[in-house]
């Protein structure tokens, strides 16, 4: 399959997806429903599904596998869009990584982050993302929140200093917020908290850091992902984006993009187009445990086709009409116009 491309998009026009998107179907209540696809073979599956970029954790493509992974990616015609250290899978991080009360664990997390940056460079990744997986608490007063902020500031300052010394200023680091799951309460729970944290970093490091918002994570927090993305854009900090769908404030469902809120998704794409977003548009989705192995890439192709359809509809939205509705204070009419653009 030829790679999907977003017509008239500035910068990167291809799409990305994670190797974890096509996993074995496990969930907290049940084991695998499919045999695992070898990790390097997943690169070919994603390429065949029309992806231009793959994403991976350091537990999926190990540091010592990076050169071989890049070679395999070149062979199948896909590039590394994003690489991320796992601060959540190893039991040592069960009560946090950079915010752990144990200084030895905090030091280990920082070393893992540094190694992930080196690995990302070998892979040719466009951005390194840090997700707050275990940063937070389940019971009150088990951590001092003020100390947690200081630890995050110190940790990311150390990571930035290492990145600049080793690789120079041409590297992008993004933080991905999420409000809960797996922890009951998570630090860096939303875009605003991440932007605040970046503002607390040393001034010489702030330009290296941005945000990787995920639409479902905003919804889990009861927030509007359109506004979250607009905050990132206004701050010049939208370094990456993860698209998916979420059916209310439940567990993180990673449903196909365009499934639950297509009108809001249409509006989001209008915002990205008008802002001239140049980064990769990627999916954080998950093949459901009910899907047959031979159809495991459906989650990727369905999301991609929904995105391309909505992208074309967003290009056709009359921006002058939007402005007229605003000027005339016809908010309901504007909503109706967008619905017409969506449904025809």
Region locations from a protein language model:
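Glycine-rich, aromatic-flanked loop segments that form ligand/cofactor-binding clefts
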Residues: 7-20, 61, 66-87, 119-124
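Glycine-rich, proline-tolerant flexible connector loops at the mouths of alpha/beta enzymes
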Residues: 53-73, 132, 138
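Short, flexible, mixed-charge acidic loops at enzyme active sites
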Residues: 31-35, 86-95
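Short secondary-structure capping/turn micro-motifs that flank functional sites
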Residues: 62-63, 89-90, 136-137, 249, ...
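Histidine-acidic metal/acid-base catalytic patches
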Residues: 1-50, 140-141, 154-162, 168, ...
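Active-site acidic/histidine proton-transfer and metal-coordination neighborhood
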Residues: 2-7, 74-75, 79-80, 92-210, ...
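Short loop/turn segments at strand-loop or loop-helix junctions that form parts
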Residues: 17-23, 85-87, 130-135, 175-178, ...
């Amino acid at each position: 399959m030829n790679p999907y491309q977003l017509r008239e998009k500035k910068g990167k026009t291809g799409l990305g997806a994670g190797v974890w998107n096509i996993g074995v179907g496990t969930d907290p209540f049940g084991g695998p429903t499919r045999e695992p696809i070898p990790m390097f073979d997943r690169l070919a599956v994603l390429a065949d599904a029309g992806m231009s970029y793959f994403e991976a954790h350091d537990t999926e493509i190990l540091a010592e596998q990076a050169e071989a992974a890049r070679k395999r990616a070149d062979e199948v015609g896909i590039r590394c869009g994003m690489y991320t250290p796992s601060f959540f899978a190893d039991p040592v991080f069960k009560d946090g990584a950079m915010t752990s009360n144990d200084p030895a664990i905090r030091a280990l997390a920082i070393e893992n982050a540094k190694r992930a940056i080196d690995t990302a460079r070998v892979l040719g990744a466009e951005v390194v993302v840090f997700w707050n997986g275990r940063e937070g608490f389940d019971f009150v007063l088990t951590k001092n929140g003020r100390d947690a902020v200081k630890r995050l500031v110190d940790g990311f300052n150390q990571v930035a200093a290492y990145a600049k010394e080793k690789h120079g200023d041409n590297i992008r680091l993004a933080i991905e917020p999420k409000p809960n799951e797996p922890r009951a309460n998570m630090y860096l729970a939303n875009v605003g908290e991440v932007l605040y944290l970046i503002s607390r970093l040393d001034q010489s490091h702030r330009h290296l850091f941005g945000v990787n918002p995920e639409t479902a994570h905003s919804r889990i927090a009861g927030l509007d992902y359109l506004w979250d993305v607009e905050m990132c854009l206004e701050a010049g900090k939208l370094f990456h984006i993860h698209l998916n769908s979420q059916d209310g404030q439940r567990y993180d469902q990673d449903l196909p993009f365009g499934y639950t809120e297509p009108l809001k998704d249409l509006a989001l794409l209008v915002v990205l187009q008008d802002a001239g977003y140049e980064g990769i548009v990627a999916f954080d989705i998950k093949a459901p445990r009910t899907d047959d192995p031979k159809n495991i890439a459906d989650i990727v192709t369905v999301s991609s086709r929904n995105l391309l359809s909505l992208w074309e509809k967003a290009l056709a939205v009359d921006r002058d009409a939007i402005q007229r509705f605003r000027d005339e204070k016809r908010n309901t009419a504007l909503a109706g116009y967008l619905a017409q653009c969506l449904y025809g």
